Every structure is written in structure tokens, then in C-alpha cells.
Amino acid sequence: MTLQSQKAILSSFIEGAPPGELADVVADIKNLTSSTPNLINELGPAFQKYNEEQFTTVKLPGSSQHVIISSHNSLGGSRYYDVETSTSFAFDHTTQKASAVETYVVEGAQGDLTKSVIKALAPYVKEHYSNAAYGAWPIENDSKVAIIIVANKYSPNNYWNGRWRSLYILDPAAGTVEGSIKVDVHYYEDGNVRLLTDKPVTASVSATGAAIVKEISAVEKKYQEELNRSFASLSEGAFKALRRQLPVTRQKIEWEKIAGYRLGQDIGGGGARR
């Protein structure tokens, strides 16, 4: 296999890493490429693609607030900026660490609207999401505004991790917002199940921060309700059909006897009694 083929395969592993599991994927890659340890250092573009597409969040040095990494707030050269904190910073895509923080003030035609959206987003995100980050940035020569919400929920002790990503592109001149809501959940106890959804969004809005966030709230609430109905349908339909049926013996279960069994001996049948 050529070096380029190896890099392409390893890059696909990185870009497809489930939420909260990039470090595990990197560890596996290092084990697979132990004979060429420097190969991981050549996968920078894959790490950048993952971080920007997954809206990776990072805490700036000396701050407790998370900021977002995306193509919409990139300044080039692995530097990004955040409107709410009026800062720009360097970001290492491999280690996912921020550094070299500088003051960065957003101005221009959509500057006030962008700040208005962020002000309205703050209480909405705080009320409806845990461990979430949000942001808004002028894009396309200051003609539109990109709005992002990302919420992460990691529960490795229970063998699942999940991420919610919302991206909306606001066109103030047209009075429209277009985008998508993506949900990625990985469950890996006694199996490997991954839920990936992509919901396109189109709506008409007034060009005020409060009105825009009100529409976002309505769209996201409706989609969450749709997801809940889909989960219930899967549980009672496809997933139920996959479950192994318990045998019907028509015999009473002796619960007291079962409670007295010694795990690994009576139930497992292993080892002699002491």
C-alpha cells in the first residue's frame, strides 16, 4: 500500500470519529502505524476538517467559556475569532488547544446584527442545552451571518456519546434563514450503533436578533419532537424485532434461589464450592 493510500484511509478514520472519541481514534492510529510514528503528523488537513465540520469547542487560556472552531470564523493560518469575547486565537488542530489570544473587534455592515443575534442566543442556549456553545459571524463579504449552536453530551461510562450541531445562514436582505440540524449519537455497549441525522431548515425571518432566535427555537423544538417520535417508533419496531425472545417455559421463577446464587459459580458453573 502506498503512503498516499495509507494517509487517505487514516484521514477517513479521523474525519469519521464519533463525538468525544477522537482521542481514542488517534490512539488506535498510533498503534496501527507504530512502525511509522511520524505519519500521524502528516494528517493535519484531516484534523482541521474534523474540527471545523464538527464545530469543535475549546476554552481560551484563562477563560471558562467555550468558543467554536468552524470554517465560518476562520482567519486562515489556523487562527479563529469569536465575536462575543472580541478575541482571535491560534488553534492546534491535532491537540485541540488554543493559544496566542489577541483582541479582535468585529465591525462592518452586519456587526450590530451579529451581536444582536448572539445576545438573544445566550439565554436560549443556556435554557435548552447543557454543555453547549454558540456563536455568530458575518460571512460572504459581510452580506450574511452564520449562526452555530453545538451541544455535546459524553457518557463513556455508559458507553454512549452524542453531539447536536445547528448551522443557520441568515440572509438579512432576503429575510430568510437556511441551514441544517445534525445529530450524531454513538452507542457501543455490547454492539455498535450510530445514529446520524441531517435535517435541512428553511424559514422566513425578520432581521432582528430576537426574531431570528425565536424562529430557531421553534424549528429546533419541532425537530426534537420529531426525533422523539422516531426513537419511539424504532424501539417498538425495528429494534424490538432484533431482540432475542425469551423462551416460554410456563414455569415459575424461583427468585429467592436466584438471589442466593454466587456469581461466577452457580450461574456461570465455574469453580468448585468452598
From Swiss-Prot:
Keyword tags: Actin capping, Actin-binding, Cytoplasm
Instruction: Please verify whether the record's keywords include Amino-acid biosynthesis.
Output: no
Known InterPro entries for this protein?
A: CapZ_alpha, CapZ_alpha/beta, CapZ_alpha/beta_2, CapZ_alpha_1, F-actin_cap_asu_CS
Mind telling me which GO cellular component terms the entry cites?
actin cortical patch; F-actin capping protein complex
Name the source's superkingdom. Answer: Eukaryota
Which family does the similarity line name? Belongs to the F-actin-capping protein alpha subunit family.
Q: What does this protein do?
A: F-actin-capping proteins bind in a Ca(2+)-independent manner to the fast growing ends of actin filaments (barbed end) thereby blocking the exchange of subunits at these ends. Unlike other capping proteins (such as gelsolin and severin), these proteins do not sever actin filaments.
Q: What is the annotated quaternary arrangement, including any partners?
A: Heterodimer of an alpha and a beta subunit.
Protein name, UniProt field: F-actin-capping protein subunit alpha
